[in-house]
Amino acid sequence: MTIKLHDLQPARGSKTTRTRVGRGEASKGKTAGRGTKGTKARKQVPVTFEGGQMPIHMRLPKLKGFRNRLRTEYAVVNVGDISRLFPEGGTISVNDLVAKKAIRKNSLVKILGDGKLTVKVTLSAHKFSGSARHKITVAGGSVTEL
Protein backbone atom coordinates (compact mmCIF):
# COMPACT_ATOMS: atom_id res chain seq x y z
CA MET A 1 0.00 0.00 0.00
CA THR A 2 1.34 3.43 -0.91
CA ILE A 3 1.07 6.47 1.32
CA LYS A 4 -0.72 9.44 -0.20
CA LEU A 5 -0.78 13.07 0.94
CA HIS A 6 -4.42 12.93 2.04
CA ASP A 7 -3.61 9.94 4.30
CA LEU A 8 -1.00 11.83 6.37
CA GLN A 9 -1.94 12.77 9.94
CA PRO A 10 0.03 14.44 12.75
CA ALA A 11 1.41 12.11 15.44
CA ARG A 12 -1.00 11.34 18.27
CA GLY A 13 -0.50 13.80 21.15
CA SER A 14 1.51 16.33 19.13
CA LYS A 15 -1.40 18.73 18.54
CA THR A 16 -2.66 19.68 21.98
CA THR A 17 -4.20 23.04 22.83
CA ARG A 18 -2.30 25.00 25.45
CA THR A 19 -3.78 25.18 28.93
CA ARG A 20 -5.13 28.62 29.73
CA VAL A 21 -4.23 29.04 33.40
CA GLY A 22 -6.12 31.17 35.87
CA ARG A 23 -9.45 30.90 34.01
CA GLY A 24 -11.76 29.11 36.41
CA GLU A 25 -11.38 26.54 39.17
CA ALA A 26 -11.69 23.53 36.84
CA SER A 27 -8.55 24.15 34.80
CA LYS A 28 -5.64 25.48 36.85
CA GLY A 29 -7.69 28.33 38.22
CA LYS A 30 -7.10 30.46 41.33
CA THR A 31 -3.33 30.07 41.96
CA ALA A 32 -2.65 28.96 38.35
CA GLY A 33 0.05 26.43 39.26
CA ARG A 34 2.12 28.96 41.23
CA GLY A 35 1.47 27.50 44.69
CA THR A 36 0.30 29.74 47.53
CA LYS A 37 1.72 33.06 48.64
CA GLY A 38 5.30 34.26 48.40
CA THR A 39 7.17 36.36 45.86
CA LYS A 40 7.00 33.75 43.11
CA ALA A 41 3.22 33.55 43.46
CA ARG A 42 2.80 37.29 43.07
CA LYS A 43 5.54 38.26 40.59
CA GLN A 44 8.94 37.13 39.28
CA VAL A 45 12.24 38.52 40.55
CA PRO A 46 14.98 39.14 37.94
CA VAL A 47 17.54 36.37 37.41
CA THR A 48 20.29 38.81 38.39
CA PHE A 49 18.69 39.64 41.76
CA GLU A 50 20.91 38.38 44.60
CA GLY A 51 18.46 38.68 47.48
CA GLY A 52 19.48 42.16 48.63
CA GLN A 53 23.20 41.39 48.67
CA MET A 54 25.33 43.91 46.77
CA PRO A 55 25.16 42.69 43.14
CA ILE A 56 28.27 41.41 41.38
CA HIS A 57 28.17 44.15 38.75
CA MET A 58 28.37 46.77 41.50
CA ARG A 59 31.02 44.90 43.51
CA LEU A 60 33.47 44.73 40.62
CA PRO A 61 35.55 47.83 39.82
CA LYS A 62 34.73 49.97 36.81
CA LEU A 63 36.92 49.64 33.75
CA LYS A 64 39.18 52.62 33.22
CA GLY A 65 40.18 54.02 29.87
CA PHE A 66 39.59 52.42 26.50
CA ARG A 67 41.42 50.51 23.76
CA ASN A 68 42.08 52.63 20.68
CA ARG A 69 41.05 50.73 17.55
CA LEU A 70 43.02 53.05 15.28
CA ARG A 71 46.32 52.47 17.09
CA THR A 72 49.16 51.26 14.86
CA GLU A 73 50.94 48.18 16.18
CA TYR A 74 54.67 47.87 15.54
CA ALA A 75 56.87 44.79 15.66
CA VAL A 76 59.69 45.63 18.06
CA VAL A 77 63.34 44.93 17.29
CA ASN A 78 66.03 46.03 19.73
CA VAL A 79 69.48 47.32 18.81
CA GLY A 80 70.99 44.37 20.71
CA ASP A 81 69.03 41.96 18.50
CA ILE A 82 70.40 43.64 15.37
CA SER A 83 74.02 43.28 16.51
CA ARG A 84 73.34 39.60 17.34
CA LEU A 85 71.53 38.83 14.04
CA PHE A 86 73.89 40.85 11.82
CA PRO A 87 77.39 40.60 13.38
CA GLU A 88 79.00 41.79 10.12
CA GLY A 89 76.82 44.96 9.99
CA GLY A 90 76.00 46.51 6.62
CA THR A 91 72.72 47.67 5.11
CA ILE A 92 69.66 46.20 6.84
CA SER A 93 66.10 46.52 5.54
CA VAL A 94 62.75 45.22 6.77
CA ASN A 95 63.02 42.28 4.34
CA ASP A 96 66.36 41.29 5.90
CA LEU A 97 64.72 41.21 9.35
CA VAL A 98 61.92 39.01 7.94
CA ALA A 99 64.52 36.68 6.38
CA LYS A 100 66.26 36.28 9.78
CA LYS A 101 62.81 35.68 11.38
CA ALA A 102 63.17 38.64 13.73
CA ILE A 103 59.72 39.85 12.61
CA ARG A 104 56.81 38.58 10.54
CA LYS A 105 56.22 39.76 7.00
CA ASN A 106 53.82 42.67 6.35
CA SER A 107 54.39 44.11 9.83
CA LEU A 108 55.50 47.64 10.69
CA VAL A 109 58.88 47.75 12.43
CA LYS A 110 60.06 49.92 15.29
CA ILE A 111 63.70 49.84 16.38
CA LEU A 112 64.24 50.30 20.13
CA GLY A 113 67.49 51.06 21.94
CA ASP A 114 67.83 48.09 24.31
CA GLY A 115 71.23 46.38 24.15
CA LYS A 116 74.62 47.33 22.67
CA LEU A 117 75.47 47.96 19.04
CA THR A 118 79.09 47.31 18.12
CA VAL A 119 78.93 47.22 14.29
CA LYS A 120 78.26 49.94 11.71
CA VAL A 121 74.78 49.49 10.22
CA THR A 122 72.62 51.40 7.74
CA LEU A 123 69.12 50.62 8.95
CA SER A 124 65.75 51.31 7.31
CA ALA A 125 62.57 50.83 9.35
CA HIS A 126 59.20 52.48 9.94
CA LYS A 127 60.03 54.02 13.35
CA PHE A 128 63.05 54.55 15.60
CA SER A 129 63.18 55.42 19.27
CA GLY A 130 65.46 58.28 20.31
CA SER A 131 67.92 56.00 22.11
CA ALA A 132 68.09 53.58 19.15
CA ARG A 133 68.76 56.44 16.73
CA HIS A 134 71.50 57.72 19.05
CA LYS A 135 73.21 54.31 19.45
CA ILE A 136 73.19 53.66 15.69
CA THR A 137 74.73 57.04 14.87
CA VAL A 138 77.35 56.70 17.65
CA ALA A 139 78.38 53.32 16.19
CA GLY A 140 78.93 55.09 12.84
CA GLY A 141 75.73 53.95 11.14
CA SER A 142 72.72 55.78 9.73
CA VAL A 143 68.93 55.44 9.91
CA THR A 144 66.24 55.80 7.25
CA GLU A 145 62.55 56.05 8.14
CA LEU A 146 60.18 54.43 5.66
Swiss-Prot record:
PROSITE patterns: RIBOSOMAL_L15. One of its GO terms (biological process) is translation. Residues 1-42 are annotated as: Disordered. Keywords: Ribonucleoprotein, Ribosomal protein, RNA-binding, rRNA-binding. The keyword Transcription regulation does not apply. GO terms for cellular component: cytosolic large ribosomal subunit. GO terms for molecular function: rRNA binding; structural constituent of ribosome. Pfam families: Ribosomal_L27A. Part of the 50S ribosomal subunit. Belongs to the universal ribosomal protein uL15 family. Binds to the 23S rRNA. PANTHER family: 50S RIBOSOMAL PROTEIN L15 (PTHR12934), LARGE RIBOSOMAL SUBUNIT PROTEIN UL15M (PTHR12934:SF11). This is Large ribosomal subunit protein uL15. It comes from Mycobacterium leprae (strain TN). The gene is rplO.
